[in-house]
Amino acid sequence: MRRGLVLAFDTATPIAASALVRDGEVLGERASRAASVLADADDLLRGAGLAPADLDALVVGTGPGSFTGIRIGLAAARGLALALGIPAAGVSTLAALAAASPGGLPVIDAQRREVFTLVDGEPVARSPAELDFEPGTILIGDGAVRYRPELEAAGAEIPPDRDVVHVPRARFHVLLAGDFGDADLVEPIYVRAPDAEKAIA
Amino acid sequence: MRLILGLETSCDETAAALVTHDGDIRSNVVASQAVLHARFGGVVPEVASRRHLELVAPVIREALAEARASLDDVELVAVTRGPGLIGALLVGLSAAKALAWGRGLPLAAVDHLHGHVASLYLEPAPLEPPFLCLLATGGHTLLLDVRARSGYRSVGTTIDDAAGEAFDKGARLLGLGYPGGAALDRLAADGDPEAFDFPVARLDGLDFSFSGVKTALLYAVRALDAGELERRRADLAASYQRAIVRALVERTRAAAEQLGHERIAVVGGVAANSELRASLAEAVLAPLELCTDNAAMIASAARYLTPVAPPGFLELDAYAAA
Ligand SMILES: [Zn+2]
């Protein structure tokens, strides 16, 4: 975790998260859509009587999730890092979800009857039926909510649909952020190749 | 220096440019993805969007370096908002918003087609409206009534394929790969443009249709055996090119006459076509490097728009269709 004023946001999932953190203290958090994440950031800064130029570092969610959503966040981080000459760090959306619920397995809706989850710490896309977990494991994320009946039948514990643990919260991105550096080196986690690549592979 | 930073990511070129308020181009960086898409035989939106994300910050840095400028010299950010591939547009728009917001700069959201027209307003030979503009690219074929630099009115369009698309598809039928417009132009130079008669549909009004001529080429190719096809490829290319160019030229002149325009201009990638340049000799043409997608034209268009101050532009969305 980095000291100073840190803006974090994650636009990989349908509910985009942002947070403003100063020296580890959360000054504010927002949840909205990817397209509004910079407007949220502007709100957070104004609420604290601050401006973009006051930022010391950025943390951005790298997915997996919606391809377009991931890019909206990463393009914003690259533009902002360039504008302010500040470093950035990437944190996977799955890791941020898991951090909010220790021992929980993050499960993000990946569309096409699949979910994104972690297997041995690596992000993968799997059908819900293929998920491998001990009975009693807590599953969190919009994928866990979407496939609740079959996952619960397999022994998963899933908090109520409206529980905040199902949505990434950017305070956890700040908590997990390790290597700060050039924003261009923060890579998206797509997991899946473009369909066209598969078609000619 | 007081500069406009332009950013363009609507299709398969990632581009950044620095332009002065007087229309002087200080830098114009275009990272083309054509090679990346060649193996797919066309632009793949997801592949293009991924590449835009990789290139967006590097092209901005390169544009600044080439202009020997820093972000302190930039006082307006201009970005393409649409039309184009939505996922590709969003990369540029998101980066531009963040950059402008971070620097406390205003943002001008530019219509890509207005950008093509505004390529004519750049130094060293800026064009003053009124004029009739043929905008012909891989995605659009439009006849535009231009009365002021701040906009245009569309008076004709294609009802199916764009002219550039017709060239690319014809090139593919002739085994020239993708994108093949330029290769078709080169091959046509060795052929007889009267060898084959490829009819172009004549629509009422000022609209175009190029799907029929493409089908005619397909049938002509199928009617020839392999050896004969090889021998007559140049004739096919020349005749096909002649048919498309003739339709473009006729309609463009008719539109100019109807609207009382004394001057005709041509913008867009198809303006690079040698036969079009020769056939419409009276037309004003944008320099070749400004014909294809670039960011100098986006920065140029921004000079005639009212920019939005921060944070008003943060909720702006991209649009895919004109
Ligand atoms: Zn274009």
Kindly give the residue locations of the regions a language model identified:
Chain B
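Conserved phosphate-binding catalytic cores of ATP/NTP-utilizing and phosphoryl-transfer enzymes
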Residues: 1-2, 110-132
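N-terminal beta-alpha supersecondary unit
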Residues: 2-83, 90, 112
